[in-house]
Amino acid sequence: MKALLDLFKQVQQEEQFDAIKIGLASPEKIRSWSYGEVKKPETINYRTFKPERDGLFCAKIFGPIKDYECLCGKYKRLKHRGVICEKCGVEVTLAKVRRERMGHIELAAPTAHIWFLKSLPSRLGMVLDMTLRDIERVLYFEAFVVIEPGMTPLKKSQIMSEDDYLAKCDEYGEGEFVAMMGAEGIRELLRGIDIEKQIEQIRAELQATGSEAKIKKFAKRLKVLEAFQRSGIKPEWMILEVLPVLPPELRPLVPLDGGRFATSDLNDLYRRVINRNNRLKRLLELKAPEIIVRNEKRMLQEAVDSLLDNGRRGKAMTGANKRPLKSLAEMIKGKGGRFRQNLLGKRVDYSGRSVIVVGPTLKLHQCGLPKLMALELFKPFIFHKLETMGIATTIKAAKKEVESQTPVVWDILEEVIREHPVMLNRAPTLHRLGIQAFEPVLIEGKAIQLHPLVCAAFNADFDGDQMAVHVPLSLEAQMEARTLMLASNNVLFPANGDPSIVPSQDVVLGLYYTTRDKINGKGEGMTFADISEVIRAYENKEVELASRVNVRITEYELVDKDAEGDARFAPKVTLQATTVGRAILSEILPKGLPFSVLNKPLKKKEISRLINTAFRRCGLRETVIFADKLLQSGFRLATRAGISIAIDDMLVPPAKEKIIAEASAKVKEYDKQYMSGLVTDQERYNNVVDIWGAAGDQVGKAMMEQLQHEDVVDREGKTVKQESFNSIYMMADSGARGSAAQIRQLAGMRGLMAKPDGSIIETPITANFREGLNVLQYFISTHGARKGLADTALKTANSGYLTRRLVDVTQDLVVVEDDCGTSNGVAMKALVEGGEVIEALRDRILGRVTVADVVNPETQETAIEAGTLLDEDLVELIDNIGVDEVKVRTPLSCDTRYGLCAKCYGRDLGRGVLVNSGEAVGVIAAQSIGEPGTQLTMRTFHIGGAASRAAVASSVEAKATGTVRFTATMRYVTNAKGELIVISRSGEALITDDHGRERERHKIPYGATLLVQDGQAIKAGTQLATWDALTRPIVSEYSGTIKFENVEEGVTVAKQMDEVTGLSTLVVIDAKRRTAATKGIRPQVKLLDANGQEVKIPGTDHSVTIGFQVGALITVKDGQQVHVGEVLARIPTESQKTRDITGGLPRVAELFEARSPKDAAVLAEVTGTTSFGKDTKGKQRLVITDLDGNAHEFLIAKEKQVLVHDGQVVNKGEMIVEGPADPHDILRLKGIEELAHYIVDEVQDVYRLQGVKINDKHIEVIVRQMLRRVQIVDVGDTKFIPGEQVERSELLDENDRVIAEGKRPATYENLLLGITKASLSTDSFISAASFQETTRVLTEAAIMGKTDDLRGLKENVIVGRLIPAGTGLAYHRARKAREASERERAQAIAEEEQSLFIEPPVVQATTEGEGDNV
């Protein structure tokens, strides 16, 4: 019996470990793992199906096939456990040891491990300092390598061909030097390396050299050698002498019916290796000719290569069916590999899936579970109950009972599922709310019932969607599901803090209809004593639902909270002017909400705001009950309303004909202008598209105006307008279904259509769906509509990949402490663009913690202290006292080393309170950004292919009244007509109020005409400037006579004849299209004064030269007199595509991957004064002289737009040449805060265009992870190498250590890595390997002998432990503390024994995870 108990104990012994180390295994280590050498390629005997002895499935090496039974059958049963059979040599034990026992193959000749040879950069090449090509020639027996030059002039590791070798042997005599071929040669070279000496040498050379390339090369090699030195791995272990053999159960051979076998490819690969190895052994014994042996060695090397990584070098080995065999490397990498398929994506039992249907009668925390499904899922619980109740005595009996489905079983099922939550999941699970817990309610039928309010969170609809059910088994799991995942505890979106349980569609329509008011409805003006009276009147049809009446309504105001924290309310009765519907609806209002929140038409946005208000004021429980009541009322009222739609509801505006006729006339006018040569074809197209766009908008407006209002007679008999009760209008207005743009297509005109490439077809569809489309119109529509569908299919995959990269880069970011105590933060202002407030300050700082006191600008008193979490009331206060900017904490400046602190993160948006310790904020951020990704269409902003374009701005007007101020960068000249023409490229006009506070700012483009003066007082709506939106001018800043230079027809310019109009213009042509001789010359204009001298720039002796960009149309003639501010040429802008080219998802991905844009802007490296040096061929030379008088030169291509002028003072990081900004430059010159602003604003721009709300902090979390590595500049006394990239936390730890010892810390600069690169360069090799480029990551980690501390979530999922987040964080902390105390105790005991002069017993102090390489 005791033996049996021991057996059970032995099974439970799970291993505790703190880290996982990877390294290279020495030949001795491989032999120590092995249970025997595999000598034969045979697998199993074809007659007996028993494994062959010494073969690949040998039972003697790998263990028995049946539990506790040797192969020949001499020993069976448990009693012989551990006996080794003398006949067949098999140990009697469990058959599952065949999953863990390894074998080995003694290779007759050493072979190189292909990963260390071919995985770039080649590790073998680095260590030996040889090129990959040379090493390959040696390994594959094409050349000799010198091992020992002896007394000869040859050099060590010199390569020579066979002929050379023979010649040298003749020359110096044999035995004077040693040269070898194949892996043996490489192994000898590796053995001969003295790592310590090499490191010293390289360090010395690093000090001596100055060339960047050499430093890089040395640093790389130094890193590898130091890794070898540190990890105690010998370089010669990269050459295999012994090959381990995988346990047979992991490469199974399964008999199929019909006598055939299915086998893992690995068996084939192993067989090839064994065959070639045995043949080589035999050839060596027979002392075969060198050339034959060499060939066999080469083949062995190739067989081993294929086994490890098939297809990495040369052609892949193929099986019988001509497909490449799947090698060990393929087993672990990619989507179907070990990491992603089996470790990160396990299938779970106790789960089921079925179609979902709507469950309108359910409470929010319930779901309907089909009886049969529940019976299957809860089987173990039912069995247990049957046994405890004594109905069944054994499991078998219980099983029978359940299968016969007796009435008692259903009763027990009811009992078992009571308060046992189940988890529902809808794929794709894009964010936290994709899995929620519900209490099951048993239902008949086979479909799962889902509560309508959670559909938004699951993104589910009932058109055939399926959902999966999972049962949490343990008590802890049930508890977590109930407290953290229950649907009624997740009412806010973690992405933005808005309610997720907002009603949609019919419910919204019902509530909207109920709360609308109507002029002169039945019973208008009646007054009621209370709500029950209203209901009586309504039920007796004395009043209509929308009639305006007066009702006495009781509101409950919050007085205070009692000792238990329960709210106390005081009733307050008032007479309210309202409608019948609103009065009736007010019955469901929770206490603490005023009636005013309901006393308006409830559109979707209003309902969302209503639920939000309820949540903030009345708490979670009341809100959930309220939402459920709203839902029930909405469904009931929508049914009672009886709204339907008919074709007659789509009213076509009478003005449509006239608008279209006018537009056509305008288009004809432009065609005429084009014919007579006044405009180019491009300009004509742009104008036509604009005209039709405007016409479409006008028709839409006329249609909406007609739909919106209807004429009714009021009580006095006057005809008045009231909001329409047109069904289609109500659906769109309430937000239940459809939008103005869709109604426009139904009843207005469909408008312009886009081609699949995004360009707009200039003939619009003037018809709408009510009138019907003709064949041509239908054909044009199909274009865009089909592209929309194709796009959707393609972009889903892209969006998923973005989410995956984001999750991978942030997965180890968890809130680990309450406060890191930093005093850094970021100043938040309202986001203003073009004078419009896009995002108010209150929205940006809500849920953040203040860094500094917030001061009232009027009284200068402290309004809010530092370290306060800003909630709704406090941001309201900030709004009211008129604070313009607030400094708040941000994840970017958090000082916590491994993780984040709660104060820097602020409010957990999904819960509405300060974030808890252990929250995996990284993953939440990744999900919040990735989840709407699918909605970010790839620049198809089509509604069924209809084109929508940003109307081109051609003027700017003031929104506020105040005073105009121009910034210092604004420069303008007065032209002959007395107009002010702007000649600066970065000038801005500000408008300030009476207190001098900036209200708005507008960029004024180059070439615009200013309509106001600096310092002028203006009213709101005043135009500040106008410009031509369709062309960019080149303006002369000086007056004089034109003198063309290099304007040669056919060389730099071309005469463009318009075939239609017969007129010609000069167009500057692209330098690439010219011949080599003429490439350097650029067309330009010089100005001559009255004496024929060149006009100079004032204060310099440079002549005024004005260059023309490619594509410019020159509008002046040679010798023409020009005035200041006159246009010399115009550059037509690109034709309008549908919105922005890099819109949507690609733009977001580009920002997070931190890609440098092509033709990036040039930023000033220093603060100083600009001047122009001598131009070189094709480049202009811009010089910035800093404050110390040092000159910094920039060479800029001539076609680039320089934004600064001579003598301008620029600040470090200011843009001096136009172009898209490069995030790396922003980081280097302006710092982390500016970079964060840039990325956050750019990402938000993309999402905002789609109407998606994401809180800034999520993007900041990602940026923090992109900035987590730094580059060492000066190593000080630390262990780093110059130019090395290390984890910020590691560097800070090392610097702390060095400073503590009184030495010099390292200096560093910040690095910005794209998300893919950041994921791959993480400290955890397990996480990186499971992400991408598995081979490269593992190769590097093995050479470095890396240790994975299992800090992140992913690593812990992979090794199968609780993740260090949420409840798992507490578990891991407790475990670590326990271990530390045990270690201390062991130490104390050891010291005590020492003091007693007793010879202490050997205490093994290897903590978990130390010791052997894994």
UniProtKB/Swiss-Prot annotation:
Question: What UniProt keywords apply to this chain's record, in alphabetical order?
Answer: DNA-directed RNA polymerase, Magnesium, Metal-binding, Nucleotidyltransferase, Transcription, Transferase, Zinc
Gene Ontology cellular component terms for the protein in this record: DNA-directed RNA polymerase complex
GO MF annotation terms? DNA binding; DNA-directed RNA polymerase activity; magnesium ion binding; zinc ion binding
Which Gene Ontology terms describe the biological processes this protein takes part in?
A: DNA-templated transcription
Query: What top-tier enzyme class does this entry carry?
Result: transferase
> Which reaction is catalysed here?
RNA(n) + a ribonucleoside 5'-triphosphate = RNA(n+1) + diphosphate
Cofactor binding note of this UniProt entry: Binds 1 Mg(2+) ion per subunit.
**Positions that bind Zn(2+) 1:** 70, 72, 85, 88
Q: What does this protein do?
A: DNA-dependent RNA polymerase catalyzes the transcription of DNA into RNA using the four ribonucleoside triphosphates as substrates.
User: Quaternary form?
Assistant: The RNAP catalytic core consists of 2 alpha, 1 beta, 1 beta' and 1 omega subunit. When a sigma factor is associated with the core the holoenzyme is formed, which can initiate transcription.
Q: What's the protein name?
A: DNA-directed RNA polymerase subunit beta'
Q: Which organism is it from?
A: Cupriavidus taiwanensis (strain DSM 17343 / BCRC 17206 / CCUG 44338 / CIP 107171 / LMG 19424 / R1) (Ralstonia taiwanensis (strain LMG 19424))
